[in-house]
Amino acid sequence: MLKLIGSLVLLASAAEVIASPLAESVAPSITLEKRASCTFSGSNGAAAAMASQKACSTIVLSNVAVPAGTTLDLSDLADGTTVIFEGETTWGYKEWSGPLLQISGKNIKVEGASGATLNPDGARWWDGQGGNGGKTKPKFFAAHGLTSSSSITNLHILNTPVQAVSINGCDGLTVTDMTIDDSAGDTQGGHNTDAFDIGSSSNIIISGAKVYNQDDCVAVNSGTGITFTGGLCSGGHGLSIGSVGGRSDNTVENVSFTNSQVTKSDNGLRIKASKGKTGTIKGITYSGITLSSIRKYGILIEQNYDGGDLKGDPTSGIPITDLTMENISGKGAVASSGHNIAIVCGSGACSNWTWKNVEVTGGQTYGSCENVPSVAQC
């Protein structure tokens, strides 16, 4: 009997040894299983999508109605997730600071399906004051921390309460064929409807954007390796660097605006260095830009920005170096009450500029230019 029991024990041990490699070989198939593709819609779609971020490789938001006072927060996505907007995405009304939409992650792909719109219906907040008073208005889209070749493609954004897209803490992000249409704000009190505010980001490409708004088309406040190309900017404040200075990050380097149009805007091209502050503005290029219907300044470069343009004596704490202005077409572009080009630099603070084939006319000559590099015109 004891002999039989011993034999059974030996057989059981052998079975364990034989079985264990098979158990190990099964485990990887579980970890490699693909996550699901998920579609969310209606008034409960936002909450369901937010709760399912790690479970879905593709998140489709189809006619989602986001409740008032809620951020559609997709900042915890699994690496490599695709987010697709279908139909009309809407937001309920509440006075608060937002954002209404937030997306973050590595290698994230955000896409707008054909005919899709993201419509926060900003006219409900517009009162002509923007972020300076009146109703508390939510910012729209916080594209923060998008890295590792993330992309945003074919989004159509309609009527933002104030600022449309904030790009911050991003590296390697490409934005293609985005439309931001706040044109209704021209007559309904839209204000501070910046299209792209960029800070502390690197290696950003914005291509083929169409912007209709009442503030900066692009404002690069800090960052390196930023490109805006093939864009249309209408109704706002033009293509801007800054204001630079007085922030936690005050370096702007290697920024290019190319092959774009600025029309029906207060300014065409603008570089703003804050008076009395420190920082760096280096390697900025404006090339192949067409200006038309500019109300105030065709080109404005100032080192005395102080909450407004051209305020008092310029300072030298934020040098503007290695600036290139080339192939700027603006014949008759500036209103007769405006100024073609205004350059106000601190002593020795504007240097190593390139200025080729720049024609901006129609307005007045600015009579208070200071410390203009010899190659430039003012």
From Swiss-Prot:
Pfam families: Glyco_hydro_28. Its EC number is 3.2.1.15. Glycans are attached at N254, N327. Disulfide bonds join C38-C56, C217-C233, C345-C350, C369-C378. It is found in: Secreted. One of its GO terms (cellular component) is extracellular region. This is Probable endopolygalacturonase NFIA_008150. It comes from the Eukaryota. It catalyses: (1,4-alpha-D-galacturonosyl)n+m + H2O = (1,4-alpha-D-galacturonosyl)n + (1,4-alpha-D-galacturonosyl)m. PbH1 repeats lie at residues 147-169, 170-200, 201-222, 247-273, 281-303. Residues 1-19 form the signal peptide. It comes from Neosartorya fischeri (strain ATCC 1020 / DSM 3700 / CBS 544.65 / FGSC A1164 / JCM 1740 / NRRL 181 / WB 181). One of its GO terms (molecular function) is polygalacturonase activity. Residues 20-35 form a propeptide. Keywords: Cell wall biogenesis/degradation, Disulfide bond, Glycoprotein, Glycosidase, Hydrolase, Repeat, Secreted, Signal, Zymogen. The active site is at D215, H237. Involved in maceration and soft-rotting of plant tissue. Hydrolyzes the 1,4-alpha glycosidic bonds of de-esterified pectate in the smooth region of the plant cell wall. Its main location: secreted. Belongs to the glycosyl hydrolase 28 family. One of its GO terms (biological process) is cell wall organization.
